A protein has these predicted regions:
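Short, flexible helix/strand-to-coil boundary loops that buttress conserved ligand/catalytic motifs
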Residues: 1, 77, 104, 243, ...
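Radical SAM enzyme core and accessory elements
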Residues: 223-300
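Radical SAM/AdoMet-radical enzyme domain recognition
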Residues: 14-37, 44-159
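Radical SAM enzyme [4Fe-4S]-AdoMet core and its adjacent flexible, acidic
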Residues: 98-101, 106-113, 117, 121-215, ...
Length: 300
């Protein structure tokens, strides 16, 4: 997190909930079955629970999940569950309060843990904890996260450090998944699990003697571009077919045009996004192209 915080968008630049629902209804009618709500931090937007309730009522949508930093989860966990959220992902890169404060610039780790406990008590299952592993920053905590998965029914997902668009990519902090697995095997027995429909890009492993499981996401060392089936809609109405490409299509003019044939125009733009989806990203090349947006502005 930059010390000065993140630049916010003017209210009029952000899609209204009506506009989001319009896009979601079109997408679901044309084959999308899952929606993930991300950020930034989605729970800071007023009325988010109402949006989820409306999404949940769309015929054909079978799964709604949410990624959060957890700071407001204690307040919203029960409402989210009732609204139709099926699964929760919580970004948590450290178990150490001081390191948490250094990484996030906020002393709110107690709030995050209160949110995790509330989500568990509410009935969310699975609860996934996303851990970006950084050499020299938090990699020594790998055994601690493994121990947490032994004690709690959480899915710990170790994620390779990758470019986020927020300044230069500090490659010295990168650790490939193979090395992370080696570190895990030093403290626990793990065995690969068959793929599950809700795994996404993660490869899951059973943790011997554990209540939870371990997963690995390898966007740099073993990218999953050939199986990527995701589209992203940013808060300001841009449709993106790749997390690591600045190629995007602005849907906002269509949604605000007053046209009687918005459906046909959305179809054209969705088809364009899908037909121009890159075959693969370039983040593991020597010269990494800079991203025009931070990851928080895209929805990682």
């Amino acid at each position: 997190m930059p010390e000065q915080g993140l630049k916010t968008l003017p209210h009029q630049e952000i899609l209204t909930y009506e506009e989001i629902i319009r896009v979601a209804e079109y997408a679901v009618r044309n084959g999308i079955t899952k929606i993930r709500i991300t950020g930034g931090e989605p729970l800071i937007r007023k009325g988010i629970v109402g949006l989820i309730e409306r999404l949940h009522r769309i015929p054909g949508l079978v799964d709604i999940s949410l990624t959060t930093n957890g700071t407001l989860l204690e307040k919203y966990a029960h409402q989210l569950f009732q609204a139709g959220v099926c699964r929760i992902n919580i970004s948590l890169d450290t178990l150490d309060p001081e390191r948490f404060r250094t990484i996030t610039r906020r002393a709110v780790m107690d709030d995050v843990w209160a949110g995790i406990r509330k989500a568990e008590a509410t009935g969310f299952d699975p609860i996934k904890l996303n851990v970006v592993v950084l050499k020299g920053v938090n990699d020594h905590e790998i055994p601690d996260f493994v121990q947490l998965a032994k004690e709690k029914p959480y899915h710990i997902r170790f994620i390779e450090f990758m470019p986020t668009g927020a300044g230069p990519y500090q490659k010295e902090h990168y650790i490939p998944t193979a090395k992370i697995i080696e570190r895990v095997r030093k403290v626990a027995g793990i065995s690969s699990l068959p793929p599950h429909i809700n795994d996404g890009p993660a490869k899951r492993y059973k943790l011997e003697g554990g209540k939870g499981s371990i997963g690995f996401i390898s966007p740099v060392s073993s990218h999953f571009c050939d199986t990527c089936n995701r589209l992203r809609l940013t808060a300001d109405g841009k449709l993106r077919s790749c997390l690591f490409s600045d190629q995007e299509i602005n849907l906002k003019p269509i949604l605000r045009s007053g046209s009687k044939d918005i459906e046909a125009e959305l179809k054209q733009q969705f088809q364009q996004a899908l037909s121009t989806k890159p075959a693969g990203h370039k983040i593991n090349s020597d010269k990494i192209p800079p991203l025009g947006r931070t990851m928080s502005g895209i929805g990682g």
